Curated annotation (Swiss-Prot):
Name of the protein: 23S rRNA (guanosine-2'-O-)-methyltransferase RlmB
Location(s) in or outside the cell: Cytoplasm
Entry keyword annotation includes Transferase: yes
Organism expressing this protein natively: Burkholderia sp
Example of a GO MF term: RNA binding
Length: 247
């Protein structure tokens, strides 16, 4: 039986309407909002044959679990996604670019990581099934639409999954504050999986041991570490820069 979930906010729902319109079943909206953005949104939802339901602010708050829903909430069917590494890799054309997250439990950080992954053209974000943030409505809203465009694959054992990626010819590069090699001194223009640990805790030991190499982002100021989404963006776009330079 298909799983249902709720999304809220214009970006998350609009991205789903554009990417998987048939999965949007119902849309609750605030009729008090009659601006151009709401009109365009409702037109898009109606074009997808979603059922439109007028709802007041208290109803929208109850549905979304928060007040920052922008006046729109949608009930959607889970989109079909890759359920295994093998399936994921079979869908990728060209050199894979993957982001793996180890121990990232904050849904807002997950959403931000999905957003930078989308911006860099990454093919997927991978995380362990346990001790990791789920793809909740809060994560989807923070992703600003990227949760509907970037596959989020959860695996039982992240270290084992990384070894499988290596066996498939994908270079696995981890990041850590105590690494001696700089991110900017390593070749990243091939098939690549970048592994990010949680801020503070970093990668777990087995995850780190599964990496081909571990690098650091050189910091010139006084802070000791970066937010995981910021660090992910730096690493992903360095890989993109090297790929473009090679062309």
């Amino acid at each position: 039986m298909p799983r249902l979930k709720l999304l809220h906010g214009f970006h998350a729902i609009t991205a789903r309407l554009r990417a998987f319109p048939a999965t949007v079943n119902e849309v609750w909206y605030d009729p008090a909002r009659q601006d151009a953005r709401m009109r365009a949104f409702l037109h898009l939802a109606a074009s997808a044959n979603a059922r439109l339901i007028a709802a007041d602010a208290s109803r929208l708050n109850a549905l979304s679990g928060e007040k920052r829903h922008q006046g729109v909430v949608a009930r959607v069917t889970e989109a079909t996604r890759a359920h295994s590494l093998e399936t994921l890799l079979d869908t990728i054309e060209g050199q894979p670019l993957l982001l793996a997250l180890d121990g990232v439990t904050d849904p807002h950080n997950l959403g931000a990581c999905l957003r930078v992954a989308d911006g860099a053209g990454a093919h997927a974000v991978i995380a362990p099934r346990r001790r990791a943030a789920g793809l909740t409505a809060a994560a989807a809203k923070a992703a600003n639409g990227a949760a509907e465009t970037v596959p989020y694959l959860t695996v039982i054992n992240l270290a084992r999954a990384l070894r499988a990626l290596k066996n498939a010819g994908i270079q696995v590069i981890g990041t850590a504050d105590d690494a001696t090699t700089s991110l900017f001194d390593i070749q990243l223009d091939g098939a690549l999986a970048l592994v990010m640990g949680a801020e503070g805790a970093g990668m777990r030991r087995l995850t780190r041991e599964a990496c081909d190499e571990v690098v650091r982002i050189p910091l010139a100021g006084h802070v000791q570490s970066l937010n995981v989404s910021v660090a992910s963006g730096i690493c992903l776009f360095e890989a993109v820069r090297q790929r473009l330079k090679r062309l």
